[in-house]
């Protein structure tokens, strides 16, 4: 098992953040502008958040696996997809939960408002089943405050929580559940996906035996070492790993050059 100290975690974070800032500046993104990436996308700890906000995040996170964002395209086709499925806000979670996948898939195929094809049936079935399961779970809550309280509040951190949620939602694994939580504003969670796992392995913080739960704890420890949310640590590494400054117009190849630069400095 890989070992590390608090000082090593702080050193890696400082190097990573400085590295990202430098590369961002080369593309015209200032340190101040970079900070916008450290804000959760669907923060429910704001005055106007509702359970609809939570469901929208579910529908987005459900597609955040391998190639599915290029199939579902929920971020670009949200209105078309919801219209095709007959879903309107405020969502009626009890009614949505009564659906079955084949019925919803047929609605998509028959809709004139939804121009994208559904030839990737397996991906759509996974996504639609998740949409049904998540509606069933949300139907247990009367309001957003009940939902937030059930998860322990904005600054909570309990790896058992994403584990329990993932069992309620079909094909919603541990990493996707963490993605869902962090983008809702539960800022002490990160997403232990392939990008983060490969990054930590390259930095010799993990090995092939390290679990997703352990990756989650390492990122939390690194965040604590510099007094920032785990969300921020996650996003720094994610931006380096994916090359995707999605709130700006440029993309960069950063992960390998970052790892090489850090290891060279040691």
What do these predicted ranges mean?
Residues 1-123:
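Structure-specific DNA junction-binding interface
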């Amino acid at each position: 098992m890989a070992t590390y100290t608090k000082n090593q975690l702080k050193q890696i974070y400082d190097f990573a953040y400085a590295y990202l800032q430098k590369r961002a500046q080369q593309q015209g993104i200032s340190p101040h502008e970079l900070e916008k990436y450290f804000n959760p996308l669907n923060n429910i700890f704001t005055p106007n958040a509702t359970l609809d906000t939570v469901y929208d995040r579910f529908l987005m996170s459900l597609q955040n696996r391998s190639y599915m964002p290029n199939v579902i395209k929920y971020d670009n086709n949200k209105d078309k997809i919801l219209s095709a499925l007959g879903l309107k806000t405020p969502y009626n979670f009890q009614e949505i939960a009564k659906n079955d996948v084949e019925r919803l898939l047929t609605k998509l195929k028959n809709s004139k408002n939804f121009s994208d094809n559904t030839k990737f049936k397996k991906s759509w079935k996974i996504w639609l089943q998740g949409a049904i399961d998540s509606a069933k779970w949300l139907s247990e809550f009367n309001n957003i405050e009940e939902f937030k309280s059930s998860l322990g509040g904005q600054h909570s951190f309990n790896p058992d929580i994403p584990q329990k949620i993932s069992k309620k939602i079909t094909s919603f694994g541990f990493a996707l559940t963490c993605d869902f939580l962090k983008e809702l504003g539960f800022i002490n969670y990160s997403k232990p996906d392939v990008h983060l796992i490969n990054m930590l392995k390259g930095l010799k913080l993990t090995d092939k035996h390290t679990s997703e739960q352990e990756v989650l704890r390492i990122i939390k420890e690194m965040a604590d070492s510099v007094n920032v949310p785990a969300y921020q640590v996650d996003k720094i590494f994610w931006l380096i790993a994916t090359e995707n400054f999605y709130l700006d117009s440029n993309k960069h190849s950063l992960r390998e050059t970052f790892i090489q630069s850090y290891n060279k400095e040691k």
